[in-house]
A protein has these predicted regions:
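Carbohydrate-interacting/catalytic domains
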Residues: 3, 9-12, 17-18, 33, ...
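Active-site region of glycoside hydrolase catalytic domains
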Residues: 21-25, 29
Length: 228
């Protein structure tokens, strides 16, 4: 999935770039960005154009990446965090485990990806891969511990994402989770930890969320279930 779309990005500033990067990197097992995305280059070739003015399609475009890093320009550290999260969580390596959850405002979107030990074992046996799905060849650097209710010590890995789709202002909503899709009962409580900030919260089926795109365009949560 590609994150770069000039028509969307040329009016949203850095928050729009972060929002698009979260969606592309968390929704799909593979993702890519156009050169210059890290620097939030967003000048269109012409008003409403899908092409960038500073595209390599039209010119040789050298960029001083080191200077940008020194000056704190762009979103390269944010993209590094997204790739770190992708590498750490096996659930993000799969495509068909994507599930959406209800949000009572259209400006926010919520989705999850979950994989259980049984699914990984079955997929690995059928695809000739140790960790399944045919496209997984390396064990992730971080694996979720066995969760309450998992059988035979098998681990599960769940990533829950909430994104503000509006790059211009803070939005708030109630997120209603489909608990069985997360491997839990409807009335179960649990702890979510934001992989971007380290913040933790107690959650259940219905949860209030407020996201300001200027400071926090998204939550990327991992889930810790209460011990049985």
């Amino acid at each position: 999935m590609a994150a770069s779309t000039a028509r969307i990005l040329n009016a949203g500033g850095p928050p729009a770039f972060k929002i698009r990067a979260v969606l592309a990197s968390m929704l799909s097992p593979s993702w890519g960005i156009y050169s210059g995305y890290e620097l939030t280059e967003n000048t269109p070739l012409r008003p409403g154009s899908e092409e960038y003015l500073d595209s390599e399609k039209y010119q040789y475009r050298p960029r001083d990446w080191d200077a940008a890093a020194r000056d704190g320009l762009g979103i390269a550290p944010f993209i590094t965090d997204l790739n770190r999260i992708r590498k750490s969580h096996l659930a993000l390596h799969w495509l068909r485990n994507l599930r959406f959850h209800h949000v009572d405002r259209p400006e926010l979107i919520c989705f999850s990806k979950r994989v259980s030990g049984r699914e990984i074992t079955a997929a690995g046996a059928s695809a000739g891969s140790t960790y399944g799905a045919g496209n997984i060849t390396e064990r992730p650097s971080v694996m979720a511990a066995p969760q309450a209710g998992e059988q035979g010590g098998a681990f599960s890995d769940t990533v829950l994402v909430v994104v503000n789709l509006d790059p211009h202002q803070a939005r708030e909503a109630t997120v209603w989770l489909d608990m069985p899709e997360l491997g839990m009962g409807w009335h179960e409580g649990f702890t979510v930890t934001d992989e971007l900030t380290g913040d933790s919260f107690r959650w259940g089926q219905a949860n209030y969320v407020r996201l300001d795109p200027a400071s926090r365009p998204a939550h990327i949560f991992t889930i810790t279930r209460d011990l049985a």
